[in-house]
Amino acid sequence: MTDDNSDDKIEDELQTFFTSDKDGNTHAYNPKSPPTQKSSASSVNWNSANPDDMVVDYETDPAVVTGENISLSLQGVEVFDHEKSSSDFTSKQVLDMHKDSICQSPALVGTEKPKYLQHSCHSLEAVEVQSVEPSLPFVWKPNDNLNCTGYSDALELNQTFDMTVDKVNCTFISHHAIRKSQSFHTAGSLPPTGRRSGNTSSLSYSTWTSSHSDKMHARETTYDRESFENPQVTPSEAQDTTYTAFSDVVMQSEVFVSDIGNQCPCSSGKVTSEYTDGSQQRLVGEKETQALTPVSDGMEVPNDSALQEFFCLSHDESNSEPHSQSSYRHKEMGQNLRETVSYCLVDDERPLMVPAFDKSEAQVLNPEHKVTETEDTQMVTKGKDSGTQNHTSELILSSPPGQKVGSSFGLTWDANDMVISTDNTMCMSTPVLEPTKVTFSVSPIEATEKCKKVEKGNRGLKNISNSKEAPVNLCKPSLGKSTTKTNTPIGCKVRKTEIISYPRPNFRNVKAKVMSRPVLQSKDAALSKVTPRPQLTSASSPSSAISRQPTVLSRTPRSDLNADKKAEILINKTHKQQFNKLITSQAVHVTTHSKNASHRVPRTTSAVKSNQEDVDKASSSNSACETGSVSALFQKIKGILPVKMESAECLEMTYVPNIDRISPEKKGEKENGTSMEKQELKQEIMNETFEYGSLFLGSASKTTTTSGRNISKPDSCGLRQIAAPKAKVGPPVSCLRRNSDNRNPSADRAVSPQRIRRVSSSGKPTSLKTAQSSWVNLPRPLPKSKASLKSPALRRTGSTPSIASTHSELSTYSNNSGNATVIKYEEKPPKPAFQNGSSGSFYLKPLVSRAHVHLLKTPPKGPSRKNLFTALNAVEKSRQKNPRSLCIQTQTAPDVLPPEKTLELTQYKTKCENQSGFILQLKQLLACGNTKSEALTVVIQHLLSEREEALKQHKTLSQELVNLRGELVTASTTCEKLEEARNELQTAYEAFVQQHQAEKTERENRLKEFYTREYEKLRDTYIEEAEKYKMQLQEQFDNLNAAHETSKLEIEASHSEKVELLKKAYEASLSEIKKGHEMEKKSLEDLLSEKQESLEKQISDLKSENDALNEKLKSEEQKRRAREKANLKNPQIMYLEQELESLKAVLEIKNEKLHQQDIKLMKMEKLVDNNTALVDKLKRFQQENEELKARMDKHMAISRQLSTEQAVLQESLEKESKVNKRLSMENEELLWKLHNGDLCSPKRSPTSSAIPFQSPRNSGSFPSPSISPR
């Protein structure tokens, strides 16, 4: 699956990682490479258009019939408010896993997706756990460091996917950590002004696995960086929770874990949470905008019974304000279970209370299922985050043998367009016994601050449309800025719809133009597979799809399990047929649902149609895949989104129905299933009122073209809204239900507008209204591009004046004014049929949509957004109630539909089709009329405002003119006075200047005379002093010369004496050394001669001995020869004798050699002894020589020193002589100058007389002789 991001084109972060299959083959994957589908080949695609966009396509189709398509999607949608320094970071990951009976390799997959809500550094972390059974070992460890532009804060994105596979277990762990400081800004697409980041992420996963004992292990690890400061519990408490669910039969479970920091609007900026029960130590978010509540849900179905779910009970506070997202999602899951099991014990001993990550939620499991839970609390402080929570949930389930499930899930959403389209492209011909599916979904919902005191008129959800005001202030309830509606038809087996509402985009640059939405076609064949599958059997088709303006939830019976991918090819052809089926199913399904439920197969398909609104950037309409059979995923995801009700009323309303669902509603609804459905529809109509602008309708009308029809047909159907029923609205709704128990769906439709008006008139239209911009008519096959909603066809651009008009409209809504014409969409919640048959399938009844659009409510404002979420909550409430009522119906009426009913169904279908056509035309007309009226109102308002401003300006300017005239008169008078004063001052100034000049000339003359007299006096004194100084200097010079000569003579004498003494000492020492050396030489010569004589004597002795021995040898030889002659007769004896003689000769030679060597050794020893003695003497003499040399060096140094001193003295003498000569010359010159000066001094002018005294040499030369040379 390839996701294209047309708008946000940022450099892709290329990452290559390796995967190895069971054979040990290692494959390198390039993130840029498109996904490939080949037999016995695995492909992983990492496509990142943005630093936050992370898409991984992991497809494996080994030789064994085992295929995996894993796409991990991370989406961050952020809105920033710089005033409050708060940002909401929402992200969603949905991962669907289906086990197929072909493959037998169980897998453990942990996917961890953090979400951060950042205000005063609180982090939101959502963790998603996925259980899959891949056939290949998969290791993926990318580290992405994302620098956010516009902020110093860095987004540190660490992802670690670690998959270890053997034939029994596979482990897939995704660790994604995003660290944020006070303001988080996604790179490339989030301006600091608060515009949502255009990050796009895609998620795709498919797998075929099956075995007799397939087990799924889901381990979840959550790091909660936000410490919860609770009045009842120690803040920043980390938890490590492990959930383990066992199922011997088909188990359909959904694990949704999100940990969201709830932020209190108090000035302290801390998260405030309350515990409903201090002993349970579970944290209930005390916030008007409920953050996502982490929940781990498991669902099991016995072989004989329908699917059963273990759900979380939401513990309400006394005021019922805090409501958890899990309560919404678990209502539907828990309805059927509550019907059968009110108190289930885990391990057959105790009810399992599963802490949903510091939320007060309990999971109750059927005693058939075993759940083990362990908690490990550890504290980690990172950055400003005070605590870290580690949550580990482990889900183990096994599927029955022979079960085959095909599922492909494609999820694409654009942060700007808020669109998620999903693909479900797998059909299997082999019949499926029971669907086994685990869906892990994390909806990108931001936790928002809770405001205990809501501003007047703003009790609903506040939608932020202005880019400069992206996040809502703390005191104001701020919605999840991005809620994602994901459309995920899941495989052949189950289609689930998750409705997620996104915040409204900015309308700064919106132009008032209605643009038709072009047909969006999927680029990939896999994308085309996403399109809602045609229902092959008409009998089950009525409930095949549920179309709604904001979201179309279609639940198709599992009759087309045998259909191949051929059915997918028929999808485009059968859109119209599906649309008709959707319409007919809405009308007929209420009465005939219980009968049809028995025929339906467990498969439920969800087609999500996101309606186009007049939002500049079409607000997100995303449907998350959920198993329709369980419809728990509906409830959970619905709970996720609508949980963001900011007003306390909305919170109370959400909790009250939750409590009712758990126990009291069971009794009343079992009696009359269809009446309960009608009541729920009516209550939903009461609580679910969507306000759609004309643009929304206009876009919907234009989408009905060619393939666009396929997309827009469901739009005419009811809006799927997340049920967040209001407690205050509840009583009138119940009354209406009583009145309408016996009514048909058409009667319900007729009554619903009245209810809506009643509710709006009661003062709560704002809570019931929903933002038009939050929903967009979006086809399911939108995965073609992440930014597909950005296309002008998808978005309805609104003019800026319309925004201005909406402010007034918002104020009117906030003031609870229900007088304006209101056209609202109401829909009947889908009602899952709980069948007791072996198939055990849920069937969600398609929603009946009602178009009630408020004419003037086009621009996306806070109240409209509030209305959106309240309507969503109301829808979810109805849905949560519907599954139970449907379950009651299925329990009471599991009989097969008779042929008469089928005929009625067909008739109703045709009627519904006709009516839907009329409705679409009316909607189009209303949209056009609304656009025109809105344009007129906007223009009129704009003109009136300009006229008022012009009148005000005219008044102010006239008053200013009067004031300026008076000021001008006063200024003219003052100016004349100033002119007169200036003239007077001018005359006075001139007189003063003349007087000053006269005084100046007089003073100059007096001063000249004075200074000339003083100059002459000083000159005379100076001449006298100069003569005195000259005489003194001459005397000093003579004295210095005499002293210098005497000292010079003394130094020379002493130096000559020292040199002579040194010479004498040197000669004496040298003679002594020579004498000693000669004596030692003579002694050594005497020793040498003596040794030579002794050696000669030894040599002579040895020679004499040698001669004697030779003679003996000769005599012996003669004897031997004689013997030989005698023994010639015996040759052997002769031979032996010869040998003996040769041996003797050899011995003699050797003896001689040994003797010679001994002699040499003796000589050598003697020489060594002598040498040692000589060496000692040499060393002693060398030492003495060295000492003498040292003495000589000293003497030479002294002599050199003396010579240098002598040279210095000579130089000094020369200098002194030169100085003396210079001084004598200067004295002569001075005498001559003085003599000449005396002759002409009385007659010289002041200028000429100063010349003799300016000689520069006089001052510098006089003191120089005083320096002595020494």
Swiss-Prot record:
Residues 940-1231 form a coiled coil. One of its GO terms (cellular component) is nucleus. GO terms for molecular function: microtubule binding. Residues 39-50, 200-211, 538-547 have a biased composition (Low complexity). GO terms for biological process: regulation of macrophage chemotaxis. The modification Phosphothreonine is found at T186. Homodimer. Interacts with AGTR2. Interacts with PTPN6. Associates with microtubules. Belongs to the MTUS1 family. Residues 1-50, 183-217, 374-402, 524-558, 592-622, 701-816, 1237-1270 are annotated as: Disordered. Residues 386-396, 701-710, 759-776, 797-816, 1244-1270 have a biased composition (Polar residues). Keywords: Cell cycle, Cell membrane, Coiled coil, Golgi apparatus, Membrane, Mitochondrion, Nucleus, Phosphoprotein. The modification Phosphoserine is found at S386, S399, S443, S629, S1203, S1224, S1245, S1255, S1259, S1261, S1264, S1268. It comes from Pongo abelii. It comes from the Eukaryota. It is found in: Mitochondrion; Golgi apparatus; Cell membrane; Nucleus. This is Microtubule-associated tumor suppressor 1 homolog. The lineage of its organism: Eukaryota, Metazoa, Chordata, Craniata, Vertebrata. The gene is MTUS1. Cooperates with AGTR2 to inhibit ERK2 activation and cell proliferation. May be required for AGTR2 cell surface expression. Together with PTPN6, induces UBE2V2 expression upon angiotensin-II stimulation.
